[in-house]
């Protein structure tokens, strides 16, 4: 096991009616900006519950944050925060709203003579402070509710980049599984795929004898395999929704990634597909992951075989046959959730691969993976295999 420094300071308020504890998490004299997306939180009544919980407090609203939060939209919120002297941000929604709010939190305190896109260009390394934020989660997927990362898009340049900073880690997160009952099936399926791939990005790498982290990861994967499809069939099954919600949080709160090698190449290749073609984040992960595993089967051999046996109970055949079966089982799981796994399924013929590689190069994504050996040439082969 590698050395690690783990700090997970987000307070989690989990369960039915957890919103009741919201008010006491926010300073009583705060000027609060509630951020949300396209309006589903209004239709479902979640926003009304939040406003009721904060009745009597100084509250402003900012809606319209996109599924891939856009820098251009978020800068309008930054302007509002600065003008209105907002002192606390409350994100109400899924990972995109949370990620966008993290950017707002950091950008509002960024030096005014520097374009806040610099936050993405430097990966968040130069963030010195941020407005504190909390969240009310309505879509389990990204784990953004209890981590320090965010991904932001810039429409005008076709960029989608990530940043990390402890300054934007949510102070608290309200997780009520009931809020997920009304999610459209596509978002439920995407959330399961996202959480699944977050887990394997930290698990299917190379062995370092980290038994606790491995078994935590396997537990998350088995739970998603068991309850992910049930969440689609039984949308108001509280226990199923609770398990999926908690699995997504655990997949990316730092716990399973502590002391182990991490990959993240699937995410980097996927970000370029979203930025260029507008695919859902989870759709890009489902496209890239099986192709990447097939390409990197030799360097990932030990963990792919462990994954095959412990997650899919595949124990017969040669090493390569078991790896083939594990990749096929993963692809089949995504497909059964309704998330196709080839570029052609989305009407893409691969003609944009040179442009995708150019963007990877522009963003410095030329030595990806846990071994830093996924070069542009390897990325090209992965994209080609995903057609």
From Swiss-Prot:
<dbReference type="GO" id="GO:1990002">
    <property type="term" value="F:methylglyoxal reductase (NADPH) (acetol producing) activity"/>
</dbReference>
<dbReference type="GO" id="GO:0018455">
    <property type="term" value="F:alcohol dehydrogenase [NAD(P)+] activity"/>
</dbReference>
<feature type="binding site">
    <location>
        <position position="281"/>
    </location>
    <ligand>
        <name>Zn(2+)</name>
    </ligand>
</feature>
<dbReference type="InterPro" id="IPR001670">
    <property type="entry name" value="ADH_Fe/GldA"/>
</dbReference>
<dbReference type="GO" id="GO:0005829">
    <property type="term" value="C:cytosol"/>
</dbReference>
<comment type="similarity">
    <text>Belongs to the iron-containing alcohol dehydrogenase family.</text>
</comment>
<feature type="binding site">
    <location>
        <position position="99"/>
    </location>
    <ligand>
        <name>NADP(+)</name>
    </ligand>
</feature>
<comment type="subunit">
    <text>Homodimer. The crystals contain two dimers in the asymmetric unit.</text>
</comment>
<feature type="binding site">
    <location>
        <position position="38"/>
    </location>
    <ligand>
        <name>NADP(+)</name>
    </ligand>
</feature>
<feature type="binding site">
    <location>
        <position position="95"/>
    </location>
    <ligand>
        <name>NADP(+)</name>
    </ligand>
</feature>
<keyword id="KW-0862">Zinc</keyword>
<dbReference type="GO" id="GO:0000302">
    <property type="term" value="P:response to reactive oxygen species"/>
</dbReference>
<dbReference type="InterPro" id="IPR018211">
    <property type="entry name" value="ADH_Fe_CS"/>
</dbReference>
<dbReference type="InterPro" id="IPR044731">
    <property type="entry name" value="BDH-like"/>
</dbReference>
<keyword id="KW-0521">NADP</keyword>
<dbReference type="GO" id="GO:1990362">
    <property type="term" value="F:butanol dehydrogenase (NAD+) activity"/>
</dbReference>
<feature type="binding site">
    <location>
        <position position="96"/>
    </location>
    <ligand>
        <name>NADP(+)</name>
    </ligand>
</feature>
<feature type="binding site">
    <location>
        <position position="149"/>
    </location>
    <ligand>
        <name>NADP(+)</name>
    </ligand>
</feature>
<feature type="binding site">
    <location>
        <position position="182"/>
    </location>
    <ligand>
        <name>NADP(+)</name>
    </ligand>
</feature>
<feature type="binding site">
    <location>
        <position position="40"/>
    </location>
    <ligand>
        <name>NADP(+)</name>
    </ligand>
</feature>
<feature type="binding site">
    <location>
        <position position="194"/>
    </location>
    <ligand>
        <name>Zn(2+)</name>
    </ligand>
</feature>
<feature type="binding site">
    <location>
        <position position="68"/>
    </location>
    <ligand>
        <name>NADP(+)</name>
    </ligand>
</feature>
<feature type="binding site">
    <location>
        <position position="160"/>
    </location>
    <ligand>
        <name>NADP(+)</name>
    </ligand>
</feature>
<feature type="binding site">
    <location>
        <position position="147"/>
    </location>
    <ligand>
        <name>NADP(+)</name>
    </ligand>
</feature>
<feature type="binding site">
    <location>
        <position position="179"/>
    </location>
    <ligand>
        <name>NADP(+)</name>
    </ligand>
</feature>
<comment type="function">
    <text>Exhibits NADPH-dependent reductase activity for a broad range of short-chain aldehydes. Shows highest catalytic efficiency toward butanal, propanal and the highly toxic aldehydes acrolein and malondialdehyde (MDA), which are produced mainly during lipid peroxidation. Mediates resistance to reactive oxygen species (ROS) elicitors, such as paraquat and potassium tellurite, probably by protecting the cell against the toxic effects of reactive aldehydes derived from membrane lipid peroxidation.</text>
</comment>
<comment type="function">
    <text>In contrast, Sulzenbacher et al. detected significant activities only in the presence of alcohol and NADP(+). They reported in vitro NADP(+)-dependent alcohol dehydrogenase (ADH) activity towards various alcohols, with a preference for alcohols longer than C(3), but the affinity for the substrates is poor, suggesting that these compounds are not the physiological substrates. Perez et al. did not detect dehydrogenase activity with short and medium chain alcohols such as methanol, ethanol, propanol, butanol or isopropanol.</text>
</comment>
<protein>
    <recommendedName>
        <fullName>NADPH-dependent aldehyde reductase YqhD</fullName>
        <ecNumber>1.1.1.2</ecNumber>
    </recommendedName>
</protein>
<feature type="binding site">
    <location>
        <position position="267"/>
    </location>
    <ligand>
        <name>Zn(2+)</name>
    </ligand>
</feature>
<dbReference type="Pfam" id="PF25137">
    <property type="entry name" value="ADH_Fe_C"/>
</dbReference>
<feature type="binding site">
    <location>
        <position position="138"/>
    </location>
    <ligand>
        <name>NADP(+)</name>
    </ligand>
</feature>
<dbReference type="InterPro" id="IPR056798">
    <property type="entry name" value="ADH_Fe_C"/>
</dbReference>
<dbReference type="GO" id="GO:0008106">
    <property type="term" value="F:alcohol dehydrogenase (NADP+) activity"/>
</dbReference>
<keyword id="KW-0560">Oxidoreductase</keyword>
<keyword id="KW-0479">Metal-binding</keyword>
<dbReference type="GO" id="GO:0008270">
    <property type="term" value="F:zinc ion binding"/>
</dbReference>
<dbReference type="GO" id="GO:0042802">
    <property type="term" value="F:identical protein binding"/>
</dbReference>
<feature type="binding site">
    <location>
        <position position="198"/>
    </location>
    <ligand>
        <name>Zn(2+)</name>
    </ligand>
</feature>
<dbReference type="Pfam" id="PF00465">
    <property type="entry name" value="Fe-ADH"/>
</dbReference>
């Amino acid at each position: 096991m590698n050395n690690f420094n783990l700090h997970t300071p987000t307070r989690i308020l989990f369960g039915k009616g957890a919103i009741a504890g919201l008010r006491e998490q926010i300073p009583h004299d705060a000027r609060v900006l509630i951020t949300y997306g396209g309006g589903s939180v209004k239709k479902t009544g979640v926003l009304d519950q939040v406003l009721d919980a904060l009745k009597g407090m100084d509250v402003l609203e900012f809606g319209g944050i996109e599924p891939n939060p856009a820098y251009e939209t978020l800068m309008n919120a930054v302007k509002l925060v600065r003008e209105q002297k907002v002192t606390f941000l409350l994100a109400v929604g899924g990972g995109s709203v949370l990620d966008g709010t993290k950017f707002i939190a950091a950008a509002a305190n960024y030096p005014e003579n520097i374009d806040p896109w610099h936050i993405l260009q430097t990966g968040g390394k130069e963030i010195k402070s941020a407005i504190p934020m909390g969240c009310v989660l309505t879509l389990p997927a990204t784990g953004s509710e209890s981590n320090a990362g965010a991904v932001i898009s810039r429409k005008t340049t076709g960029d989608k980049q990530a940043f990390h900073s402890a300054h934007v880690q949510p102070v608290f997160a309200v997780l009520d599984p009931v809020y997920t009952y009304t999610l459209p099936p596509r978002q439920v399926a995407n959330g399961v795929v996202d959480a699944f791939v977050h887990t394997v990005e930290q698990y299917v790498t190379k062995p370092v004898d980290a038994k606790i982290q491995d078994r935590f990861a396997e537990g998350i994967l088995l739970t998603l395999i068991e309850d992910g499809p049930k969440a689609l069939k039984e949308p108001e099954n509280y226990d199923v929704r609770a398990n999926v919600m908690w699995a997504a949080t655990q997949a990316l709160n730092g716990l399973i990634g502590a002391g182990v090698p991490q990959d993240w190449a699937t995410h980097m290749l996927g970000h370029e597909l979203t930025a260029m073609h507008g695919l859902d984040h989870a759709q890009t992960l489902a496209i890239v992951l099986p192709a990447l595993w097939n390409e990197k089967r030799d360097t990932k051999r030990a963990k792919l075989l462990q994954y095959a046996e412990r997650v899919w109970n595949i124990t017969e055949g040669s090493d390569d046959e078991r790896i083939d079966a594990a990749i096929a089982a993963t692809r089949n799981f995504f497909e059964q959730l309704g998330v196709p796994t080839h570029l052609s399924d989305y009407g893409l013929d691969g003609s944009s691969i040179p442009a995708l590689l150019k963007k990877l190069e522009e963003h410095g994504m030329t030595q990806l993976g846990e071994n830093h050996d996924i070069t542009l040439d390897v990325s090209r082969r992965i994209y080609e295999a995903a057609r």
